[in-house]
Design a protein with these regions (language model features):
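Acidic, surface-exposed loops and disordered segments
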Residues: 1-240
């Protein structure tokens, strides 16, 4: 059994070696899995490969105990990594058998994945696969463009296929939701534990770390990024 390093390293597209055995194929595919998004870019997942099976674990050492006290977003992030793994496997011609582990386990295991028989890819899979290395979390202000016609309905259908629910927010309740979000932000920023946790994952632009949030992700200059962690920790923006 081998625990696999899971930092999201600088990525370049490659071809799955035809000679690779099951463990080598899985290790290769995990290069796509770890490009999934996560809150504060904490990358809260770990993988173990044994034979033709890879096991997905939540890495609770990277849990955000203040902003995510029930580990809800940690589990969602691991689910995103699992989806990337499935998409990459399908792109390279493999079906996957996924067993989601129900309930909480002491070792944090969330799922088991095996590669199954060869299969053909689809245009939808190829579109998702091409997006994996280009996906970025936008931490900058959003623009005012509306999504293309039909996109929200398509996303809702895709969510339902995965057992989830996407509920669009209509214009009539958008302001109420925005006010709730703004009030939640104010309450969080008044909490020194929240600010300390956020500061711990805030990086300068010169960081060599592959996790956390560098200043350039928020459009900051190099100079501003050096003082950002201190300002985050000390500034009580909830009373501004």
């Amino acid at each position: 059994m081998r625990r696999v390093e899971t930092d999201a390293r600088p990525f370049s597209a490659a071809t799955l070696p035809v000679w690779a055995g099951p463990a080598e194929r899985l290790r290769f595919l995990l290069g796509y899995a770890v490009l999934a998004p996560s809150r504060h870019n904490v990358q809260p997942w770990a993988f173990e490969i044994e034979g033709d099976e890879v096991r997905l674990f939540g890495d609770f050492r990277r849990a955000l105990h203040v902003v995510d006290p029930r580990d809800r977003e940690l589990i969602m992030s691991c689910g995103a990594a699992l989806l990337n793994l499935r998409v990459a496997a399908a792109h390279f011609g493999y079906a996957t058998s996924v067993e989601v582990v129900a309930g909480s386990r002491r070792d944090g295991m969330l799922a088991r994945v095996r590669l199954e028989e060869r299969r053909s890819t689809t245009p939808q899979i190829e579109e998702l696969f091409r997006a994996i290395p280009h996906r970025r979390t936008n931490r900058l202000p959003l623009d005012s463009r509306e999504p293309p016609p039909g996109l929200v309905a398509e996303l809702a259908r895709e969510a339902a296929l995965e057992g989830g629910m996407l509920r669009p927010v209509g214009e009539s309740v958008r302001r109420a939701v925005a006010e709730l979000v703004a009030e939640g932000d104010r309450l969080q920023w008044r909490n020194p534990r929240f600010r300390a946790e956020l500061s711990a994952w805030t990086r300068s632009n010169a960081t060599r770390r592959l996790d956390g949030m560098p200043g350039f992700a928020r459009g900051m200059s190099d100079a501003a990024s050096w003082v950002q962690p201190v300002l985050v920790r000390l500034a009580d923006a909830g009373h501004v």
